[in-house]
Regions:
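Cell wall/extracellular polymer interaction/catalysis modules
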Residues: 4, 21-91, 97-117
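Polar low-complexity intrinsically disordered regions enriched in Ser/Thr and small residues
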Residues: 11-14, 66, 75, 127
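N-terminal Sec-pathway targeting helices
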Residues: 2-17
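Low-complexity, intrinsically disordered short peptide segments enriched in small/polar/basic residues
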Residues: 14-17, 34, 151
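Exported/periplasmic cell-wall-interacting domains
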Residues: 30-32, 71, 90-167
Length: 167
């Protein structure tokens, strides 16, 4: 009798572990969202989809194999206009220097859009030739003009837009 009671509890717990994430996923990616972003790492594109229609498609740079861009479901967060760049506390950035807002060498350029804190962003680039390549340390790079255009669209949609990143 005691074993059956514990099996029931474990079964209920397992059901919750499976059902709750599915429900959260469904609410996160509701089809009634007016805008969403789809990133294809393989195609090196970022699509803005509004009411089911592709409104814009942008070329992007993605993470190198040694520093891949994360895949999964996210929401855009804070939009930081004219950001400074502070080297993250990672090995690859050990000898890099702080870059003030507006500096030509600032890798963020005009805007950075948070999508997975603390180190993954969509942002402009000071190396537009990297678009279409696996060139970043995990962030999604866009030309400065495209990044600004995307940031304005996200702001117009309320600031927190669902985003899927897939291979």
């Amino acid at each position: 009798m005691e074993v059956a009671k514990h099996r029931w509890r474990y079964g209920a717990l397992l059901a919750l572990i499976l059902i709750i994430p599915a429900a959260l996923w469904a609410s996160f990616m509701r089809s009634d969202e007016p805008m969403r972003i789809e990133v294809s790492l393989g195609a090196r594109t970022l699509k803005v989809i509004e009411n089911g229609d592709v409104k814009n498609t942008y070329g992007i740079a993605i993470g190198r194999p040694s520093h891949p861009t994360p895949t999964g479901s996210f929401r855009t967060g804070l939009i930081d206009w004219n950001p400074a760049w502070t080297p993250p506390p990672t090995a690859w950035a050990r000898n890099k220097e702080y870059q003030p807002p507006g500096a030509a060498s600032n890798p963020m350029q005009a805007v950075k859009i948070y999508f997975q804190a603390p180190y993954y962003f969509i942002h402009g680039t000071n190396d537009p030739g990297s678009i279409g390549e696996a060139a970043s340390h995990g962030c999604i790079r866009m030309t400065p003009g495209d990044a600004s255009s995307l940031a304005h669209q996200i702001q117009d949609a309320g600031g927190h837009v669902p985003m899927i990143i897939h291979e």
